[in-house]
Amino acid sequence: MLPEDRLIQIVERFEYLEARLNAGPAAEEIAAISREYAELKPVVAQIAQWRSVQEDIRQAQAMLADHEMRELAQDELSRLRAGLPALEHALRVALLPRDAADARPAILEIRPGTGGEEAALFAGDLLDMYRRFAESQGWQFQMLELVRSDLGGVREAMARIEGEGVFARLKYESGVHRVQRVPETESGGRIHTSAATVAVLPEAEEVDVDIPAADIRIDTMRASGAGGQHVNTTDSAVRITHLPTGIVVTSSEKSQHQNRANAMAVLRARLYDMERSRADAERAADRKSQVGSGDRSERIRTYNFPQGRMTDHRIGLTLYALDRIMQGEIGEIVEALAAHDQAARLAAQGE
């Protein structure tokens, strides 16, 4: 059975927000009210559809007493009851608790792991993969920091991705990505295994994380390129150290002002993510519903180039379409992970 009391509360809350919007709320309240209203609108539509079908079923049942209408009523009841499970499932999905960060932009961080230069090259391949996927979704992809290796790989990459549902769709990408292939630097044709670490963080606003000025140290320096050479002659690069946690963030684009803003945005995201992770750990029951443990050290995926195979170890998904995947066609993987997480959360609620 669906929780009727909760359905009533949701509809009443939606009607209250609608009345507030029509009355013209204060300027500082408009954004929050509009956001909550937009989130509840599709849920209320699902509730209305479910209630309408329930009413149609009651009317059809009443018609069974009429001998002349009985056959028609039975046909109508069969049709309505056949569609009811799918409708109730959709409503249960709509009622699942939302991750408050799902609608936020995301900060993407990629770093090579074990494997030396080959790991750096693979990190660069992952960066290109996510960039292409973002472009295919119509999202904005902004590089915040990019440090190249000697052979053109990636030592460190940070990007901001903005668009509809960015964090909701990319949050399952955090973890260790392993690659098996013959490196470009390998003359003997032997397959090597290396790895890169991906972190996807929800962007945090200043109101989410309070960072006192006394808690940070800001250093400026010259930006360096591959091999350590200076790419400009001014001290435009910015390094921010968060003293209480030891977190260090660097941004080395051309504008010092922009670098400071970029580095602070990443620092806020990391601190916000730490707080979210801490809260998640305290909700042990909820952790069971997540795809994987959320641990950045967890190996989540293997890319086997000789076999053209990608395997996501968390859900046992294997696709023999590695060329397309590396070109950014990861929608099937993203949707499978989201569906698995959704099913687990529904099961946890006793569906």
Curated annotation (Swiss-Prot):
Domain of life: Bacteria
Region: Disordered, residue numbers: 279-300
SMART domains documented for this protein: PCRF
Residues that bear N5-methylglutamine: Q229
The record's account of how the chain is modified after translation: Methylated by PrmC. Methylation increases the termination efficiency of RF1.
PROSITE patterns (alphabetical): RF_PROK_I (PS00745)
Gene Ontology CC terms, in alphabetical order: cytoplasm
InterPro entries with a match to the protein in the record: PCRF, Pep_chain_release_fac_I, Pep_chain_release_fac_I_sf, Prokaryotic/Mito_RF, RF-1
Protein location: Cytoplasm
Coiled-coil zones: none
Keywords attached to this entry: Cytoplasm, Methylation, Protein biosynthesis
Name of a matching Pfam family: RF-1
A single MF term (Gene Ontology): translation release factor activity, codon specific
Role, per record: Peptide chain release factor 1 directs the termination of translation in response to the peptide chain termination codons UAG and UAA.
Family affiliation: Belongs to the prokaryotic/mitochondrial release factor family.
Cross-referenced HAMAP family: Rel_fac_1
Protein name: Peptide chain release factor 1
Organism: Paracoccus denitrificans (strain Pd 1222)
Gene transcribed to yield this protein: prfA
